[in-house]
Amino acid sequence: MKGKSLFNVFAVLAIFSLALSACGGNGSPEQPAGDGPKVTSAGFECPEPNPRVEVTSTELNLFVWTEYFPQDMLECFELVYGITLNRDEYSSNEEMYAKVSAGGTAYDLVQPTDYIVPLMIRQGLVQELDHAQLPNMKNIDSNWMDQPFDPGNKYSLPYLAGTDAIVVNTATVETIPTSWADLWNPEYAGRMVFIDDSRATIGLTLVTLGYDPNTTNPDELEEAKNKLLELVPNIKLFDSYSPKTALIAGDVDLGMVWTGEAFIANQENPDIQYIYPEEGPVLWQDNWLILKDSSHLDAVYAWLNYTMQGDVFWLTIRDFQYTNPNQAALDYAKANEPDVYNAYADSPITNPPPEVVAKGFGIEDVGEATPLYDNIWVEVKGGN
């Protein structure tokens, strides 16, 4: 599906989910690698690597999103391979890019969202994948591969995907928003949480003005900046570490969050609802990239293959309910963990309806216009 967009991917998967419905290194236990089953601190029995990659490295350095990895997955990799995972976390693409582009890090793998991938490729920060060392790449649904931001997946592999949309506590908010534009309602002053995502926030603001969310027009961006500054009094906090926490605690009543955060908040409190705005949600995909100076390539390929196994990656469906590109994981969960699978497959949060996807928009690389967006965000964040 050359040249396809995330819009097409979500559309295909939304239709597929309807068909299914119609049919019905951190704190791991100290067990040495070797013979016999390995069990995590939570009692999960670790699947054997298939295939097992030969490694000599003793560590792997990850720079990844916060709250994005099942603890059992992390522990199992350490247990079955005897490799220590060193994991640093970031809460925005911009934070990750700034640190990596400055140099001097020892990271092996990072996890950028789609629009950052071309930038990192252009900057020479990453290396090509060796597909011959990735037999478990076959487990990824082909609809998520060969995206415009990395044709042929020369550099990137999908991890998870999802949407940004409106979240609202229907028990505490009198006027329920149905559009991005509604969030400017003064009734919401000091009551909102927003993920700390410059491009998504500026993009949705552009959409409310009738502009392309990826515009490079300075006049349109200036107009968006001024409108976004009007929204700032409504935002109590920007939080990409765990925006659901403030919602569940009642510190805020509504805002803009990711798929997985909304799912968990709704599970904790059914009054917290995820609303797809009339203008459409933001559609996104997070991906693995190997940094050019990685010194643990054997461990990198061991990690990628192990975590792409269906009997391992299904843990993301259990613990972090984002849209899942790994077909083997979905098949495994459906056959072996039906409650987990059904909660995922039946949710409009993890599987947006086709009519919602049709309105959705993605964030794209804007090239030389990137500093214009950066400057807007500095000014906006200076007011909050």
Placement of each model-derived feature along the sequence:
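Extracytoplasmic ligand-binding site segments that recognize negatively charged/polar headgroups
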Residues: 60-70, 95, 106-251
